[in-house]
Amino acid sequence: MILSEALNLLPDTKGCVVILSGGLDSTITMRLAVEKYGAENVSALTFFYGQKQAFEIECAKLSTSMLGVCHKVVDASFLGDISQGFSANVDKNIEMPTIRDVLGDPRPPTYVPNRNMILMSIAAAYAETKNVDTILCGLQSTDEYNYHDTTARWIGKVNDLLSENRIIKIKLIAPFSSLSKYEEIKILQELDGNTDLLANTITCYNPGKNGYSCGKCPSCAERINAFLKLKLKDPAPYNIKITW
């Protein structure tokens, strides 16, 4: 996909709210939004919900600072509280799975119950206060370990609800939903000529105390494979040795 095609994935509107996790997908989504609308017309929301990979919040702060984007961090830690004993994403006593563990699982152990619906609702409230009608997110329906709340159908159902707003018809858009991480990184390369922005991202579900990615979890596996396919070195650090 060329850059002009990627920009056409975003609607022609005055600005947007980006749900920014601090990972690869949402960071490239934000970079594309800045190219389309200008940094002054982009606002980013990051959520803390008790996730093990809370280092990503600091990554989000760094990337928004680099791009000059308004950034808010929302405390949604109640999600982590109610998901104890259920989700490996928030419970320190539940071991993180490898990608082999989750392939074909209709509900991976990293799933946080109704997380995406809750976070999208908060983002919609924020978008309304900003008087913008577009929320961008980095959801991917093509993830090898699929969640029901990342699919095009799910996004369509959310938009059906959002369309009930009588004043601002807010719409949730996942511009990269049908793309691979490989294709996303290529878009960033065309935007910047490099992947330096991704040095301040973390995709890992189980980072070390130093903030480095584990290199073994499902998210790390996908990210590493994308860089290997492009014959590039990931600028983000890992706790295992990788031959790029």
Segment roles from a protein language model:
Residues T13-K14, L198, C214-C217:
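A structure-centric signal for secondary-structure junctions around beta-strands
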Residues S121, T203-N225:
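Local cysteine-cluster metal-coordination motifs and their immediate loop/turn environment
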Residues D143, F227-L228:
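Glycine-rich nucleotide phosphate-binding loop and flanking beta-alpha elements
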